Amino acid sequence: MPGVRGSGYWIGGSILVLIVAITLHQELSGPSELPRMAKDLQTLREDFRQLNKSCFILGASGETGKELLKQILQSRLFSKVTIVGRRKLDFEDEAYKDVNQEVVDFEKLDEYSSAFQGHDVGFCCLGTTKAKSGEAGFIRVDHDYVLKSAQLAKAGGCQHFNLESSKGANKGSSFLYLRVKGEVEAEVEELGFERFTIFRPAVLMVDRKESRPSEWFARKMLSPISYLFPTAYSVPITTLVRAMLNSAVLQSDKRVELLENKAIHTLGKMEEQEQKS
């Protein structure tokens, strides 16, 4: 039936055009300029090192946390680096020999308040999935553990708290994942850190050791789209981590910063942009 087939092609083509239009809109919309800086990034990093700041990382065993720890040590931005987790991690590389490890029971965090004392900057990369931990377990990790850790960090003197959240986070969302992410963002903000930075990455482009079929499928589907529209629906994990570190040295005067996926790309690629200019 030519007419039916033609209608199918027309509908399929229309859907494809709509997807491309939406993607292009997301690619082009929103701020894309680099932050205005009185100094170049390398100078800002040198100035930051002179401050002898200390930091802690929550979730250093996860993909973002592992990459973050690696880049922090390579950059030598902090004079002291502590990872806080439920178990001690084994490192073979000599570069990790000075990393401090605080092993805590997240169900009894009040008993481990000392682990959160004396840090200038905190990075929270804690997270699990409903598929892995169940609904209650997901809420406990992504909300309860994160919020309690932030409370202890604030009490311990942390000035700048960085939270890895998710694209689409919204405390009013009907989707559990996005609602919980939005709720914890709002509740951590209420703690009143001197500086609170929220990172909302889209799909992270990374090959996880942990099996997450839905993320694997999403990465495969998004790979060609990411090539054409790199900032719309995904972000390489290395770019996210570089954005976290670049954000720290930029010393923004904003108390609360919300960085969506496109802003993460911009911040994470500052070195490349400086080299081109």
Annotate each predicted stretch with a short phrase.
Residues 172-173, 194-231:
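Flexible, glycine-rich beta-alpha linker
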Residues 49, 55-56, 90-93, 97-148, ...:
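NAD(P)H-binding glycine-rich loop region in Rossmannoid oxidoreductase-like domains
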Residues 226-254:
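C-terminal helical subdomain
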Residues 1-47:
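N-terminal membrane-anchoring alpha-helices
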Residues 40-77:
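N-terminal Rossmann NAD(P)H-binding glycine-rich loop of SDR-like oxidoreductase domains
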Residues 87, 132-190, 194-199:
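Conserved Rossmann-fold NAD(P)-dependent oxidoreductase catalytic core, especially the SDR/UDP-sugar
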Residues 83-91:
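Short, polar loop motifs at secondary-structure junctions
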